[in-house]
Amino acid sequence: MDPLQLLQPLEAEIKGTKLKAHWDSGATITCVPQAFLEEEVPIKNIWIKTIHGEKEQPVYYLTFKIQGRKVEAEVISSPYDYILVSPSDIPWLMKKPLQLTTLVPLQEYEERLLKQTMLTGSYKEKLQSLFLKYDALWQHWENQVGHRRIKPHHIATGTVNPRPQKQYPINPKAKASIQTVINDLLKQGVLIQQNSIMNTPVYPVPKPDGKWRMVLDYREVNKTIPLIAAQNQHSAGILSSIFRGKYKTTLDLSNGFWAHSITPESYWLTAFTWLGQQYCWTRLPQGFLNSPALFTADVVDLLKEVPNVQVYVDDIYISHDDPREHLEQLEKVFSLLLNAGYVVSLKKSEIAQHEVEFLGFNITKEGRGLTETFKQKLLNITPPRDLKQLQSILGLLNFARNFIPNFSELVKPLYNIIATANGKYITWTTDNSQQLQNIISMLNSAENLEERNPEVRLIMKVNTSPSAGYIRFYNEFAKRPIMYLNYVYTKAEVKFTNTEKLLTTIHKGLIKALDLGMGQEILVYSPIVSMTKIQKTPLPERKALPIRWITWMSYLEDPRIQFHYDKTLPELQQVPTVTDDIIAKIKHPSEFSMVFYTDGSAIKHPNVNKSHNAGMGIAQVQFKPEFTVINTWSIPLGDHTAQLAEVAAVEFACKKALKIDGPVLIVTDSFYVAESVNKELPYWQSNGFFNNKKKPLKHVSKWKSIADCIQLKPDIIIIHEKGHQPTASTFHTEGNNLADKLATQGSYVVNINTTPSLDAELDQLLQGQYPKGFPKHYQYQLENGQVMVTRPNGKRIIPPKSDRPQIILQAHNIAHTGRDSTFLKVSSKYWWPNLRKDVVKVIRQCKQCLVTNAATLAAPPILRPERPVKPFDKFFIDYIGPLPPSNGYLHVLVVVDSMTGFVWLYPTKAPSTSATVKALNMLTSIAVPKVIHSDQGAAFTSATFADWAKNKGIQLEFSTPYHPQSSGKVERKNSDIKRLLTKLLVGRPAKWYDLLPVVQLALNNSYSPSSKYTPHQLLFGIDSNTPFANSDTLDLSREEELSLLQEIRSSLYLPSTPPASIRAWSPSVGQLVQERVARPASLRPRWHKPTPVLEVINPRAVVILDHLGNRRTVSVDNLKLTAYQKDGTPNESAAVVAMEKDE
């Protein structure tokens, strides 16, 4: 504007009122008429200096217009009827041509865009005219910054200020570029020279064109800055939701952060030092924690009315099918950006093209692919010389990780170099160079990926190899994948079974799939035949921790996920073949025709001329599916070692197996024998049965015999099972203990005919070695093949360990007696250490006792819910019915206010969600509750009801199943309603509909024995106009009514929680509990099998795995503590496994 024109009045507008404004070159703050500030709230006070002296005046923040342009500025009041405008508030009025250091070749950029555009004819001419019309929008100078005309941002810090940081050493080559940037920003007011107690180091970063970018390390500042809730949408979500029209445009907002002003109170936080001078930012700095979110939120809000627009930080994407519509919307975007004060860089923009680059990908009609720029960067990669270069290369490769099926496996050797680096020095080999080139070649030839279609279901295909898992995502019915995922197993996961590896891969894939699903179902295809059957995988066959299994199994209950078996998975046929581990090969014992348990033992020979006396034990059993002994052998071997006895026992079992049709399993507790058979025997056969030192094997005849048997019958499987394990800890414990007992007996047979009843423990006892628990002052001797102990109360038999559970069980099963009775019965004939504990262990495995015995301990006392402080804070709702049909209605919805007990009754034809919502909509026209409590009926747990409550801002609460005490208030009202209706409808039960208003009025005016008031009095403060009403309250003024109401409510008290019974138990995590059977029939079990407590919600509610394997919240009233748990500790897992297997 010509300076002479500033003498003329300017057109202004405040709150719709037009008035005049005058330019005042001496004004430091704008002054507006007092009348426009009467309803405004001052933000601070300042001292104003005029010709009459200094005066303190309040400052307001006001929005008004000057010359039709919106101005937001700090103002003070004036007595005049016009505005005095400060030049700093309307700098654009006297705008001088911008002069910065480097002019950009704008003409070349426009010519390039016109040449590359897919627009033709008049549309192309229209685009050229838009370039001229919006010339002020384009970036003309490097480092040119816009000015967003909005309220400045305030940078809030926490209670602790950030610590100033020292400046890093600066590369001398960067100084010239950084100084140019600082000079240009000073000219535009983006930087000011100002001292501060804070300092942030400058970190110059080289650009591809040889210049340097000024970056500041704000990490210390960001530690103290609260993260705002609104954050940028993930790029994957944006790519899946963009419109892919024929014409696509991308715009780059130049230096967008620097267009947003910050408050002067925030300047000090942004300070940095350059060449001895300290500077502060007046705009949002790059590197500040909340800059991307604040900037993106503004641009998104600015362009929200324009269709088919997506924004990610400073990148804008626009697409349409029609060229005319595309140009019209482009002009609208240009206009909005110009008026908002932004600047667009045409250097990085692409306009009206069929393929554009957005978020680092090449966007096409079908999907996304790697850009030519990215591929060129890959081709320019050279072998790294130090650790930093290697990390930079891996970061570049990682951007394209979803384009290769086995990316993680390919880059793992390169990541291993980082782990072995010595400081910044790395060891790089020709193999590493070959691997790097292989990855680059695969990425450059990678096909485009399809984008996620939110209208169809998501397909996830999973497979595994011994070292990694492979995942592919598809849109339903599509052939092109959305992305690939590759997961390399950890050292622990490599040891998993194949099923567990697949479950691990599924878990990793579902974490991503739940993001990609976009509300649609997820169909998971894998080589697992049945996901439900793997829940029954025995504990011994599980190598993963139980917490992993719980996580994996939780997916079976997710309604968003469906699992399918796919034997072929043709897309994954190139994956290396999956090799089975030993656990995966071994079937359940019931799948074998016969199972042999073998063991060998040796003792010191009683003849001094001989060193040992060995024996072997073999047990032939079948699982039908119960453990059933077919035959046993206890064979003395004479003067031999225990090792020979172990080999001889396996040889004996192999010879017996030759006579059996079908697969045979041989179990030995000798690791040496099992490993030798499975790994070394083929080598021994090939080299003539010599060991690694080329010496003949010991017991070579027996190894040859075993090799011949396996060759004649290849379906003989020999495995190792650790011996002397707790009872029922694995499938093979019982058979192993039996074989151990037989082997010990065989080793004691020298020249006698009686087979002693011994095992390894009793063998030590007879040799004068006292195992733990056997007192030394007792006398122990072998009599008639049994070990006897002489104690003060007489002689007793000490049975072998393997026989003890059966002895206890036999005594207990006579009458299913309790602990003490069973103990007395057993101890009358037998004795061993910890006999009483063993009795408890065996009894608590008795399934019949566990599911039928009554609870021995009482539940904790009922918790009193807190009474709400106001009416309408919380409602209890429930249905009564079905009742006899009356006017077409069968049910009544009962709504009770928790604070007052006031009741509303709504007749309904069915207890449905729609009927519930309809009734509650009428009630919420009076007031909206904060909480609604109900049982878990279908009408209250549906998604429709949840959506209705969410829209109303209501929180839903549910009581635990089979526990009406949780909704005691509404349950008591239900009984009162039924009782009253029954009395009023004697002889005419179908007339209840007409009496509902009478019942509601009666209940709301009935006195509560505990509070001494009626619900009507607690809600309104006065009586209703009914018989026996207190007439004094009907004539009170409104103030007196409110005073009386406050007095009544404050006098209420919450009944105290009753004291706990001395036999009450308190739940804790890990306790074994049993859930009550909901409706047990006569002579049927009253309790389900034991299950551990997973989580304690409160003293009255816990989370367990129910008998169907589902995670459920239940009340302790429906649980009993499993018997014989000391101090609430759980039983051994072996006991639970045994019961689960039995059930």
UniProtKB/Swiss-Prot annotation:
<keyword id="KW-0645">Protease</keyword>
<feature type="binding site">
    <location>
        <position position="669"/>
    </location>
    <ligand>
        <name>Mg(2+) 2</name>
    </ligand>
</feature>
<dbReference type="InterPro" id="IPR000477">
    <property type="entry name" value="RT_dom"/>
</dbReference>
<feature type="binding site">
    <location>
        <position position="314"/>
    </location>
    <ligand>
        <name>Mg(2+) 1</name>
    </ligand>
</feature>
<dbReference type="InterPro" id="IPR001584">
    <property type="entry name" value="Integrase_cat-core"/>
</dbReference>
<dbReference type="GO" id="GO:0015074">
    <property type="term" value="P:DNA integration"/>
</dbReference>
<feature type="domain" description="Peptidase A9">
    <location>
        <begin position="1"/>
        <end position="143"/>
    </location>
</feature>
<dbReference type="Pfam" id="PF03539">
    <property type="entry name" value="Spuma_A9PTase"/>
</dbReference>
<keyword id="KW-0511">Multifunctional enzyme</keyword>
<dbReference type="InterPro" id="IPR002156">
    <property type="entry name" value="RNaseH_domain"/>
</dbReference>
<protein>
    <recommendedName>
        <fullName>Pro-Pol polyprotein</fullName>
        <ecNumber>2.7.7.49</ecNumber>
        <ecNumber>2.7.7.7</ecNumber>
        <ecNumber>3.1.26.4</ecNumber>
        <ecNumber>3.4.23.-</ecNumber>
        <ecNumber>2.7.7.-</ecNumber>
        <ecNumber>3.1.-.-</ecNumber>
    </recommendedName>
</protein>
<dbReference type="GO" id="GO:0042025">
    <property type="term" value="C:host cell nucleus"/>
</dbReference>
<dbReference type="InterPro" id="IPR040903">
    <property type="entry name" value="SH3_11"/>
</dbReference>
<dbReference type="GO" id="GO:0046718">
    <property type="term" value="P:symbiont entry into host cell"/>
</dbReference>
<keyword id="KW-0540">Nuclease</keyword>
<keyword id="KW-0808">Transferase</keyword>
<feature type="binding site">
    <location>
        <position position="252"/>
    </location>
    <ligand>
        <name>Mg(2+) 1</name>
    </ligand>
</feature>
<keyword id="KW-0694">RNA-binding</keyword>
<feature type="binding site">
    <location>
        <position position="873"/>
    </location>
    <ligand>
        <name>Mg(2+) 3</name>
    </ligand>
</feature>
<keyword id="KW-0378">Hydrolase</keyword>
<keyword id="KW-1160">Virus entry into host cell</keyword>
<dbReference type="Pfam" id="PF17921">
    <property type="entry name" value="Integrase_H2C2"/>
</dbReference>
<comment type="function">
    <text>The aspartyl protease activity mediates proteolytic cleavages of Gag and Pol polyproteins. The reverse transcriptase (RT) activity converts the viral RNA genome into dsDNA in the cytoplasm, shortly after virus entry into the cell (early reverse transcription) or after proviral DNA transcription (late reverse transcription). RT consists of a DNA polymerase activity that can copy either DNA or RNA templates, and a ribonuclease H (RNase H) activity that cleaves the RNA strand of RNA-DNA heteroduplexes in a partially processive 3' to 5' endonucleasic mode.</text>
</comment>
<keyword id="KW-0239">DNA-directed DNA polymerase</keyword>
<feature type="domain" description="Reverse transcriptase">
    <location>
        <begin position="186"/>
        <end position="363"/>
    </location>
</feature>
<dbReference type="GO" id="GO:0004190">
    <property type="term" value="F:aspartic-type endopeptidase activity"/>
</dbReference>
<dbReference type="Pfam" id="PF18103">
    <property type="entry name" value="SH3_11"/>
</dbReference>
<dbReference type="GO" id="GO:0003723">
    <property type="term" value="F:RNA binding"/>
</dbReference>
<feature type="binding site">
    <location>
        <position position="646"/>
    </location>
    <ligand>
        <name>Mg(2+) 2</name>
    </ligand>
</feature>
<keyword id="KW-0479">Metal-binding</keyword>
<dbReference type="InterPro" id="IPR043128">
    <property type="entry name" value="Rev_trsase/Diguanyl_cyclase"/>
</dbReference>
<feature type="binding site">
    <location>
        <position position="935"/>
    </location>
    <ligand>
        <name>Mg(2+) 3</name>
    </ligand>
</feature>
<keyword id="KW-1163">Viral penetration into host nucleus</keyword>
<keyword id="KW-0233">DNA recombination</keyword>
<dbReference type="GO" id="GO:0075732">
    <property type="term" value="P:viral penetration into host nucleus"/>
</dbReference>
<comment type="subunit">
    <text>The protease is a homodimer, whose active site consists of two apposed aspartic acid residues.</text>
</comment>
<feature type="domain" description="Integrase catalytic">
    <location>
        <begin position="864"/>
        <end position="1023"/>
    </location>
</feature>
<keyword id="KW-0229">DNA integration</keyword>
<keyword id="KW-1179">Viral genome integration</keyword>
<feature type="site" description="Cleavage; by viral protease; partial">
    <location>
        <begin position="596"/>
        <end position="597"/>
    </location>
</feature>
<keyword id="KW-1035">Host cytoplasm</keyword>
<dbReference type="GO" id="GO:0043657">
    <property type="term" value="C:host cell"/>
</dbReference>
